[in-house]
Amino acid sequence: MHISRTMTPVQDLPVETVERKGFGHPDTLADGIAEAVSLAFSRACLDGAPGAVLHHNVDKVYIGAGHITRRYGAHELLKPAVVRINGRMSASFAGEDLGIERIQTEAAERYLSVFAPHYRVGESIVIEPNATQHTNRPDWFTPKSLDDVPDAKDPRASDTALCVAHAPASPTEHVVRELEYALWDWSGDTPRPRFCDVGQDVKVFGWREGRTLDVTACVPLLSDSVASHDAYQERIRHLESELQGIADTLADGRLDVRTRVNPTTSGEGYREYMLALGSCIECGEEGVVGRGNALNGLINPLRPRSMESPFGKNPAYHTGKVYGHLAQQLADDVHARFGVACSVWLTSPNGFPLLPPRNVWIELAPGEGPGDRELTDFVQERMAAFQVPGDLLVQRFRR
């Protein structure tokens, strides 16, 4: 394990920029559906005859190709959007069919019911399961027994991948992420849209210079709920005032925040941000896994980012998923235990034992944190307590 004290906390930089693609953004939907399918398949394997997570990766989910026209108070569906679940997935175990098309379809439908609640499967959106078993490794995706799933007993790094995580979130990151979360009601078992007239394809962008944070939030109104241009502008002004108050509370005096919602309200080229069903997949936009938020729910170009997107990858052994979650857990734990900002870097060569990672780098700010021996003992203890895949089989809605 390597420990250095050379990190400059991102909040100490003179300029910081952060973006979040909201839950209804096409890329975020693709990430979420891929993850939901992987977790549903993993749970089915653990609860059923295999008793272990079988080989799969569904990290190439594609969404798009819909077409809906909109006008004040109405819309017309011309072509449904499509969710194509691309990847590979074990189709049988010991000769018994696992029903993977049903698992894929039901998992995607459940996820869409939460984060794209205005879409109706089979009507405005179509789900196309498409996981194959093509490979040059015999019985890899059609195992006759767990002897054909060697990683069930001896998990090895499936790839040479670098994963990095950071804690805590900077004030800018906190405001940008939580501002989109504020558009959801988190009081139940699953989140629900807070406003019945607001769509889910939201993007929040923050630009900080010194203590001044400018936030631009692109928030769609549902066209059926908008009676006129004047009604649109009035609702946007109301949303802007409400989100400004939330942003001020989130900043808690650490930043001076200016929040703007759909700021272009007049002039040549003006275009209202209205959607019929809440996501731009309805008008030709496309979503693909790995093009959006990192595991922490943000896009921050000033922080190093993992080389792998974890969404849809096997939670039992895929390096880019396991190390992504482990790095974030370690960063959170170090910050909680010692009260310092830190970055955690993890990697292992392909084929090496998965846990513990062969290479661990903990980076702290100069002059901060515990001694090297105390930090090493703590990190090794936390790594030993990490369970694969158990710690990863949780639907992390707020990520």
Language model features: what each stretch is:
Residues 43, 47-122:
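Glycine-rich, N-terminal phosphate-binding loop and its surrounding beta-alpha-beta segment
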Residues 237-304, 313-336:
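Long, well-ordered mid-to-C-terminal structural blocks that present hydrophobic/aromatic surfaces
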Residues 1-18, 142-156, 210-219, 292-306:
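N-terminal, Lys/Arg- and Ser/Thr-rich interaction peptides
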Residues 1-53:
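N-terminal, positively charged regions that mediate nucleic acid binding
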Residues 77, 209-213, 267-271, 353-359:
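A short, glycine/Asx- and small/polar-enriched loop/turn
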Residues 335-399:
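Internal helix-turn-beta structural module
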Residues 106-247, 251-252, 257-265:
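Glycine-rich, mobile lid/loop segments that gate access to catalytic sites or pores
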Residues 18-20, 81-88, 213-226, 307-313, ...:
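Short, hydrophobic beta-strand segments
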